[in-house]
Amino acid sequence: MLFFILFLSIISPIESVDQRIHHPSKCDHLSKFPTKGFTMVLKVSLNGCGRFKRVQDAIDASIGSSQSKTLILIDFGIYRERFIVHENKNNLVVQGMGYSRTSIEWNNTTASSNGTFSSFSVAVFGEKFTAYNISFKNTAPAPNPGAVDAQAVALKVVGDKAAFYGCGFYGNQDTLLDQEGRHFFKGCFIEGSIDFIFGNGRSLYEDCTLHSIAKENTIGCITANGKDTLKDRTGFVFVNCKITGSARVWLGRAWRPYARVIFSKTYMSRVVSLDGWNDMGDPKTQRTVYYGEHRCYGPGANHSKRVTYAKLLSDVEAAPFTNISFIDGEEWL
C-alpha cells in the first residue's frame, strides 16, 4: 500500500500539468502511444506538452532500481543537453517522434572532456535501456586529418541488454562507443568518419545504414573493435545492413589484438576500400583478429583484393553470429 501511495504521488503532477495545457490539440500526438505495461509515464517537451523540458530531469524522476518499466516520451525538437542514464536507472524506455525529428545534441571532444570515453553527448549505464526513434548527436566540428584529441562520442552505452530501434547516431570520429554489454540495434542510421563504431560490446546490428563522411583523400573506418582476449565473447555483427557515404572506409581496424567483426548479407557501396580491413600498424594482429564477410554484395564487396587475413564465411561458419542468439537475445529482447 505504501508503494501504491508513493507511485500516485509521483505521477499525479504529470496528470495535473497535462490537464492545465491551454491548447491540448498540439499535444495529442503524445497521447497516442500505448502505455499499458508501464509503471510510470513521463513526458518531455520544449513546447509545454509535458512536465519536463530536459530529458535528464525526466530520467532523474524515474524510479531507481525498478523491476518495472518507465516510459519517457520525448516530443519533437532539438534538446541541447548532455544526459546520463545512471546505473540504478534500469528498465527505461525512451520514445522519440522520429530520429529526424527528436534529437539530443552536445559538442564535447576528447580535449574538452578529459578523455574520449568522457566526451559523450549521452551515456547509458543502466540495464535494459530501450530507445525508439530518436537521434544522438555530437555536433563538435569535423577534425582535420591528424588532429589530436578531436574524438567526439555521441552515445556511450555500457549497460547490459540495451536496444535501439529506428535511432540515429551522428558524429565524426568515434560516434558510437559500444563499450560493453549485450546490445541490439535495429533499423538505425549511424554516421561518422573514423572508428565510428568502437568498443568491446557484444552487439548485433540489423537492417542499419552505416554512412561514411570521411574526408576526401583519406581513408576512414567503420569499426574499431576492442576484443582484448581470445576468451572474450564480444564482437560486432552486422546483418542486412547498408554501407554508404562519400569517401573511402575500411570495414574495421584492429584496435585490440582479438578484434572480432562480421558483416553478413550487407550491401557495400564503392566507399568500401578494396583491401577491406586494416591491422592498425601492428602486423601481429593479423594472426589473432577475426574479420569475416558472409554473402555481402555490391561494388565494395569484391573479395579479390581483400587482405589475406579476412575470412569469407560459409553459412555454417556465419550461423553462430547472424541472429539474436549471439547476444542471448532470446532471453531479453
From Swiss-Prot:
MF annotations from Gene Ontology: pectinesterase activity
Active site: 174 (proton donor), 195 (nucleophile)
Sugar-modified residues: 108, 114, 133, 302, 323
Keyword DNA-binding annotated: no
CC annotations in GO: extracellular region
Biological process per Gene Ontology, one example term: pectin catabolic process
Binding residues for substrate: 116, 151, 253
Principal location listed in the UniProt entry: secreted
InterPro entries per record: Pectin_lyas_fold (IPR012334), Pectin_lyase_fold/virulence (IPR011050), Pectinesterase_Asp_AS (IPR033131), Pectinesterase_cat (IPR000070)
Keywords: Aspartyl esterase, Cell wall, Cell wall biogenesis/degradation, Glycoprotein, Hydrolase, Secreted, Signal
Top EC class for this record: hydrolase
Catalyzed reaction equations: [(1->4)-alpha-D-galacturonosyl methyl ester](n) + n H2O = [(1->4)-alpha-D-galacturonosyl](n) + n methanol + n H(+)
Pfam families associated with the record: Pectinesterase
Keyword DNA damage: no
Protein's UniProt name: Putative pectinesterase 14
